[in-house]
């Protein structure tokens, strides 16, 4: 039996019911040392680049490059996988889990969930929180 078989066997009703496979965008952006893994295509990325400089680190690795570049994805941090529709993020989630990544989650796959957190009031709060964390270190 291979690792993908093992992964699928663990995807029971309880697993999906608990929501262990996903993470809300607000939670992801507030998670210290988390990674926002953007798996969208080059044309999508060239149209809308997601930086999140005041929140968390962003890695842009198109889905087709994930196998060759998987060592760039930290294993010791929460990884929130993002795409614009949900299909690619789900595939990358399953792939990373099947090769031993433990703390991988599927982020909401739409721009509205992301941009609603970047309005001035919420962005100001994120900047203040990040500054306080840095001063406390």
Residue ranges and their predicted role:
Residues 81-83:
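Short, surface-exposed ligand- or partner-binding patches at beta-edge/loop junctions that are enriched
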Residues 1-34, 39-78, 87-137:
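Rhodanese-like catalytic fold shared by cysteine-dependent sulfurtransferases
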């Amino acid at each position: 039996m291979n690792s993908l078989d093992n992964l699928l066997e663990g995807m029971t009703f309880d697993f999906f019911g608990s929501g262990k496979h996903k993470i809300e965008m607000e939670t992801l952006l507030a998670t210290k040392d988390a990674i926002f893994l953007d798996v969208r295509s080059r044309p999508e990325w060239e149209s809308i680049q997601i930086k999140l400089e005041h929140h968390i680190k962003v890695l842009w690795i198109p889905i087709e490059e994930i196998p060759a570049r998987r060592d760039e994805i930290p294993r010791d941090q929460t990884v929130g996988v993002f795409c614009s529709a949900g299909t690619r993020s789900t595939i990358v989630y399953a792939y990373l889990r099947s090769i031993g990544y433990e703390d991988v989650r599927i982020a909401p796959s739409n721009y509205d969930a992301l941009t609603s957190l970047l309005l001035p009031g919420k962005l100001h709060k994120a900047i203040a929180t990040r500054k306080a964390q840095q001063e406390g270190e």
